């Protein structure tokens, strides 16, 4: 099987890179081992919320020079501030072409509400998310935090309590919704995605409107768990129109409706452009030459995927893009050079709430995001997303930005080289 580009990993980075290449007529295949981190995400995208020294960032572009000084191995520092600034409008345009509706701008961070009622700096948020600092922020002065009886993946009382501590007159109550009784009988099935599949049905809309109308009497807005709008995001707007007050959604424990919705939109866009996705398969090894890369997958061991270029978007430890042994960290498909602390005790901190050193382990790359094998740079291989070294996606609030920007950075280079 021959393609222009083979991408290993079907998460945010892999799909974004594939979409950009496919838009320009490149034949792309994505080998995807299974559920990716988007299934566990809030659906919001961060760019840069903190510098490595902990200093908060409100205007990400203004912080790139200082980031390069503090973290020269950070992917943004590798790509360069000028490249990052040039790619950001392209990222937002690509998401819009993928029919993903988001609020925010790379010029200025805003605040999104977390599932515990706190606020975190953010670049782009779902249009039905709970935000502050945007013209469309609308969670009200005395919102109702509406939980669902028996649903353990969202705690409305905790959210209301956190907001009350911030001076917001929030209160909580639970929806009974007998239409969900069948799901309640099996707690393992009483999850956000399954609830959304029930509540999104038109025949169940009237019951939901009736209960919310009663519970929210006297409240100027409603905040619900993200158990709506899985396949039809407009459901939330229709519900708000029926009630006459804004409705916003908060992420739940995984699987996440908002994250899954983002993944579905990107996957659909890639396939519509002619891209090939091989779900449930796993790249196990590869052979390299200057003219071609052959990727062998678990299900197609004897029929390699051949391409002039390969892009590694396999993620970090979470998705086995990086693998730990007792004394080392390795990249399992190509055997890339990986930067990690030589002493095992330097991998982590005892306090789980402080930045962990292992989060910054990853593949060593140059400014073009070419990785190395045995110290030698591989010119037709690229690495993008969470497999890269030099950044902490949690402490620095930059995981989505690294995935999106590195993906487009590499796609543009492949397109330029392919047109020479």
From Swiss-Prot:
Belongs to the anaerobic G-3-P dehydrogenase subunit B family. It comes from the Bacteria. It is an enzyme of class 1 (oxidoreductase). It catalyses: a quinone + sn-glycerol 3-phosphate = dihydroxyacetone phosphate + a quinol. It holds the Pfam family FAD_binding_2. One of its GO terms (molecular function) is glycerol-3-phosphate dehydrogenase (quinone) activity. Conversion of glycerol 3-phosphate to dihydroxyacetone. Uses fumarate or nitrate as electron acceptor. HAMAP family: Glycerol3P_GlpB. One of its GO terms (cellular component) is glycerol-3-phosphate dehydrogenase (FAD) complex. Its cofactor is FMN. GO terms for biological process: glycerol catabolic process. This is Anaerobic glycerol-3-phosphate dehydrogenase subunit B. Its EC number is 1.1.5.3. Pathway: Polyol metabolism; glycerol degradation via glycerol kinase pathway; glycerone phosphate from sn-glycerol 3-phosphate (anaerobic route): step 1/1.
